[in-house]
UniProtKB/Swiss-Prot annotation:
One of its GO terms (cellular component) is cytoplasm. Oxidative deamination of D-amino acids. It comes from the Bacteria. GO terms for molecular function: D-amino-acid dehydrogenase activity. Gene3D superfamilies: D-Amino Acid Oxidase, subunit A, domain 2, FAD/NAD(P)-binding domain. Belongs to the DadA oxidoreductase family. The keyword Flavoprotein applies. It catalyses: a D-alpha-amino acid + A + H2O = a 2-oxocarboxylate + AH2 + NH4(+). Its cofactor is FAD. This is D-amino acid dehydrogenase. The lineage of its organism: Bacteria, Pseudomonadati, Pseudomonadota, Gammaproteobacteria, Lysobacterales. GO terms for biological process: D-alanine catabolic process.
Length: 434
């Protein structure tokens, strides 16, 4: 049975790997000249299985008003003429309650913890290397209010059996010795089972292993639309030519909604623009040990072999990929405060990418109203964290195997209005130019 996977980021590539392991004939299509050249290219590098949290949280609406006037605000909204932007923001606001936050975080932790197990199993099986470290994540709190607010997260972590430690200043320094000079830290939440690693390196190496296993990758090819007949996809238009298969997987990140919208599916995925700096390490003893998350700025500082990756922030600004000097200054501020002697900012590489975010934080994985069309998208800032679990979960669904975790609340049907596909024949669904 032939499957076309649309997209070769970390989500598309892990999907291809697990589908091939399940016995499918797999072809991956992407417009880029290679894998992991968009959102997966230079993300924060954190595998934050325990830290997993939705952006839609209690208190965010009130904070967002204050952030409008802050230079280094973690979240920025740039209003445009896109109705999808306003619809997405409204849905996000509706998820900023204690009840919805608990439901959404529990779903995300379920997938993230499963993904950790899948990644560990994959590493043991194929020995893939990606500058990975298994030294945990430390979330820094600069105010007592931030520390107190972590209580709800801790409750959910305990519910799922995720190990954690609440650290005082001495505990922070023990975990991350290079932070001994930093004043004003009131505490931290440490998640010892979290990991780090270079997402792009992982994806490129896994793509090569996919090829060795028989997966075909076709690059520099534009996906221009879908065709369907009744409740089945009959083919995908690639550079204007129709390509047929038995099943199709949409793993196009922020561009997924544009492809499926003409099918009558309103997929609530919107790009959250993020930024990163990558700088060479100058003094290993003064660099991070693993991943640090600065709660005040929502910025992560991650250690690779000989590099520091600083990433974070979220802009609701559509598909704008311009680089903001103001955002660069925020990243430089955080890394200079925490690790002033750790890396060379004068040689830093500045990057931006679009994370495909749902308003509730949970990705959209699984079946659709079309019998042979599947989704694997909407992971937001946690695509790298959830990639292996999402790929394995999808392959199990498509193989009619019982997934190892609950399927509750993970597919598009949780949004309610997608139960019926349009019953038109031989219609072409055109994907706008990207």
């Amino acid at each position: 049975m032939r499957v076309l996977v649309l997209g070769s980021g970390v989500i598309g590539t892990t999907s291809a790997w697990y589908l091939r392991q399940a016995g499918f004939e797999v072809t991956v299509i992407d417009r880029q000249p290679g894998p992991a050249l968009e959102t997966s290219f230079a993300n924060a590098g954190q595998l934050s299985f325990g830290y997993t949290s939705p952006w839609a949280a209690p208190g965010v609406p009130k904070k967002a008003i204050g952030w409008l006037f802050e230079k280094h605000a973690p979240l920025a909204i740039k209003p445009g003429m896109d109705l999808a932007q306003y619809r997405w923001l409204w849905q996000m606001l509706r998820n900023c309650t204690h009840e919805r936050y608990a439901i959404n975080k529990a779903r995300m932790v379920r997938m993230s913890e499963y993904s950790r197990d899948c990644l560990n199993e994959l590493r043991a099986q194929i020995g893939i290397e990606f500058e990975g470290r298994d030294l945990g994540t430390t979330q820094l709190f600069r105010t007592q209010q931030q520390l107190d607010a972590s209580a709800q997260d801790i409750e959910i972590l305990a519910q799922y059996g995720v190990p954690y430690e609440v650290l005082d200043r001495a505990g922070i320094i023990q975990a991350e010795p290079a932070l001994a000079h930093v004043d004003g830290l009131v505490g931290a939440l440490r998640l010892p089972r979290d990991q780090t690693g270079d997402c792009q390196l992982f994806t490129r190496r896994l793509a090569q292993m996919c090829v060795d296993a028989g997966v075909e990758f076709r690059f520099d090819q534009d996906i221009t639309g879908l065709e369907f007949d009744g409740d089945r996809i009959t083919g995908v238009r690639i550079d204007g030519k129709l390509e047929t298969a038995d099943r199709f997987v949409v793993a196009l990140g922020s561009y997924s909604p544009a492809l499926v919208a003409p099918l009558g599916m309103r997929l609530p995925v919107y790009p959250l623009k993020g930024y990163s700096l990558t700088l060479p390490i100058t003094d290993p003893a003064m660099a991070p040990t693993s991943t640090i998350l600065d709660e005040s700025y929502k910025v992560a500082v991650t250690r690779f072999d000989d590099r520091i990756r600083v990433g974070g922030m979220a802009e609701v600004a559509g598909f704008d990929l311009s680089l903001s000097q103001r955002r660069r200054e925020t990243l430089e501020l955080v890394v200079s405060d925490l690790y002033p002697k750790g890396g060379d900012l004068s040689r830093a590489q500045f990057w931006t990418g679009l994370r495909p975010a749902t308003p509730d934080g949970t990705p959209v994985i699984g079946a659709t109203p079309f019998r042979n069309l599947y989704l694997n998208t909407g992971h937001g800032t946690l695509g790298w964290t959830m990639a292996c679990g999402s790929g394995r979960y999808l392959a199990d669904l498509m193989s009619a195997r019982q997934p190892q975790i609950s399927t509750e609340g993970l597919d598009i049907f949780r949004y309610g209005q997608y139960g019926h596909a349009p019953q038109q024949e031989n219609r072409t669904c055109v994907l706008p130019a990207r």
